Amino acid sequence: MDDALFMLGGWERFASRGQRLLVKPNMLSDRPPEAGVTTHPTVVEAVVQRLIDAGAQVAIGDSPSNAHRGVQRHWEVTGYKKVATKFQVDLVSFEGQTSVRKSVQDREYFVAQPVINNEGVINLPRLKTHNLTILTGAVKNMFGILPGFRKSDLHRKFPKPEAFSRAVVDVFEIKPPVLSIMDGVIAMDGNGPGNGRLRKAGLILASADAVALDAVAGVVMGLAPNQVHTTRLAGKRGLGNADLDRIELRGMAWEEIPIRDFRLPDSNVVNRVPEGLSRLLATLVWIQPRIDANSCTRCGKCVEACPVKCISMTRTSAVIDKDECIQCYCCSEVCPDNAVVMDRSLLARMMIR
């Protein structure tokens, strides 16, 4: 990581004495580091230490799923509380805080006050796939500056991948990070961001341009920037560089970074269908989440996370109402038991092959 920052001009370029900086990891859920779901605490620890060494005033903050229950367990299980205790920095939950109204593209959003109060955000995403946005990277990680129920509301309002990605880019535009460092030591492919397959990648990606970082992360996964809505839309708005020809890659050659046989989410076959054709093909190409009763432990996290409340709990397992499901895959994100499986139409199965 220090090598990456040296090539960007050093830590002093991004942190100065007395500067208030918020470290924003990917704390998707209360899963331990070995699950590969959250930014590894060793990465968070290294960043916090470097920022403090530069004289900055540091806090760690995020808004995970099911945060309304309280985030104390999240801090403990992810290892972030141990980091905060070691360096005597604050852990900031965005739940229950005052929200600040912001307008982007004539759409209104409510951002947690602590995010606005800090002079800069140090963004620490993890290299993972995402069932809705394909890639959850530096741009998508900033979606976490919204308090929990605000995120759920946007999932409900914008269930389609491109529309939801547009909202994600709106939120990113409100508070672009001053630096993004992606934890790609162990990546996740398949049906991420909560229940994919872990892959050894051995990468730390860093950039002052979060959009360019995501463009490079896409190459790692075998994706062009225009295949990831958040990267394409953010680049089109001028929020960063999404043109690979204009991105200078340091430390590795382009041909070295792709991961062989990297699996994209099953839902990618549906996401590739243009919005104008999606309704026409909806009965032919579909991916539908289902709860595997044999794996479900009835923890209730999917019930709480569902933005349209189409999941109910029975005596044996959670059950999804297929008629009401909007295929946002929030249930898959938060399930700690890998109990959410993806049923696929015949044509979808053929396309995935």
Please report, for each region that a protein language model flagged, where it lies by residue.
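N-terminal and secondary-structure boundary signal
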Residues: 1-293, 297, 303-308, 312-317, ...
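Extended, alpha-helix-rich binding/interface surfaces that flank or overlap catalytic cores
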Residues: 326-327
